[in-house]
């Protein structure tokens, strides 16, 4: 519906402004890294323009563009599809992996465990990820 389309535009605009502000502040303060946490899986693994990425193409493109201008470690964390994974989801305009960007997706309702994110600004990687398995939930 038109109302749904308007809501997507409003949310995308707000998220985009927030992401731009986060990267700008990181550049101005010479931050050692950026950690962005969000709920939904934006569909990094799907083809641009596909239905699975509906409403997220603009956000992913913004993350790719901002990451190209900020070479320090970036951690993107989310849930939603509820399958633990750690990967390098972003690509440059020349389709090269953006290696300083890592995505971690947390466990979900059918597989309840948790993830510990440690931050060490003195480390080259800045962020470390440890899955925490709850024995009784195996």
Where are these regions (language model features)?
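Binuclear metal-dependent phosphoesterase catalytic core
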Residues: 83-138
């Amino acid at each position: 519906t038109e109302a749904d389309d308007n809501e997507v535009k409003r949310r995308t605009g707000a998220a985009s402004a927030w992401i731009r502000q986060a990267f700008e502040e990181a550049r101005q303060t010479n931050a050692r890294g950026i950690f962005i946490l969000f709920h939904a899986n934006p569909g990094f693994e799907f083809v641009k323009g596909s239905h699975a990425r509906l409403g997220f193409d603009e956000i992913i493109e913004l993350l790719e563009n901002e990451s190209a201008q900020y070479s320090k470690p970036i951690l993107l964390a989310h849930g939603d599809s509820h399958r633990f994974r750690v990967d390098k989801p972003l690509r440059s305009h020349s389709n090269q992996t953006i290696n300083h960007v890592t995505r971690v997706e947390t466990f979900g309702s059918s597989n309840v465990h948790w993830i510990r994110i440690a931050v060490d600004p003195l480390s080259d990687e800045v962020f470390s990820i440890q899955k925490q398995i709850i024995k009784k939930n195996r």
